[in-house]
């Protein structure tokens, strides 16, 4: 069953009406095709109009939509012969980070993603995509494996942030994130990172320090959630709408700021309306970026990648 967001209320009413008319026409053979077509056209126009002018806060809602395709969906579709790998070889397994080896269009790759889960049981198992230190250390292990065997790294980012629990802090959460960023920056192979939903804080950039950083059209990427930002600055989480505006967290803002390299278009109504075409678009974008990166030597890749992120700091201070 399709889930609608607050700003999609008028579209939801029309689609519910269309469903009712279809149910009425089936058993009695009543011809309601003309009315259904009229309402369908009206619904599509309203949906297109709504998504043509999304506010930053509305994009936050879209990015968090439960029916958007998750990392496991992208891996399952785009990666052939995928073999998952588990554990950090130091503490244990963290299911918030999934990863392994496989082939992307016949190119051997290492793939890593933050996985939220799709229903309550799997969300609990994956800790809603919030990784603990062992998750980031597993990611480091996979990146190092990729470097040893010369396999490009593909990451799929969808997390509200790293797990903030005391257990994670006790096991060195900050060090694990920092080390993961460093490992990503130092990998002697191409690294392509894609933000497919929510890219939250260090938990996201731990997998996002790539040669190419791409975002889906309605994804977000930020140092802090709008709610947390509002609580700190205004002492009022209800100011999240204003915080979302100020944070410049949309793909469009980040491309303009030169913090990302490519925006991947989504279907009208967001990735949740057509997961299959969204996944294909992401695959096409990866395929477009990978050949140029594969043509570069390992020292050149690392040098350009590090300079890219160092330049962000220099430009922001100048």
From Swiss-Prot:
Residues 39-292 form the CoA carboxyltransferase C-terminal domain. Its EC number is 2.1.3.15. Pfam families: ACCA. The keyword Iron does not apply. One of its GO terms (cellular component) is acetyl-CoA carboxylase complex. GO terms for molecular function: acetyl-CoA carboxylase activity; ATP binding; carboxyl- or carbamoyltransferase activity. Its main location: cytoplasm. Keywords: ATP-binding, Cytoplasm, Fatty acid biosynthesis, Fatty acid metabolism, Lipid biosynthesis, Lipid metabolism, Nucleotide-binding, Transferase. Pathway: Lipid metabolism; malonyl-CoA biosynthesis; malonyl-CoA from acetyl-CoA: step 1/1. GO terms for biological process: fatty acid biosynthetic process; malonyl-CoA biosynthetic process. It is found in: Cytoplasm. It catalyses: N(6)-carboxybiotinyl-L-lysyl-[protein] + acetyl-CoA = N(6)-biotinyl-L-lysyl-[protein] + malonyl-CoA. Acetyl-CoA carboxylase is a heterohexamer composed of biotin carboxyl carrier protein (AccB), biotin carboxylase (AccC) and two subunits each of ACCase subunit alpha (AccA) and ACCase subunit beta (AccD). Belongs to the AccA family. Component of the acetyl coenzyme A carboxylase (ACC) complex. First, biotin carboxylase catalyzes the carboxylation of biotin on its carrier protein (BCCP) and then the CO(2) group is transferred by the carboxyltransferase to acetyl-CoA to form malonyl-CoA. This is Acetyl-coenzyme A carboxylase carboxyl transferase subunit alpha. The lineage of its organism: Bacteria, Pseudomonadati, Pseudomonadota, Alphaproteobacteria, Acetobacterales. The gene is accA.
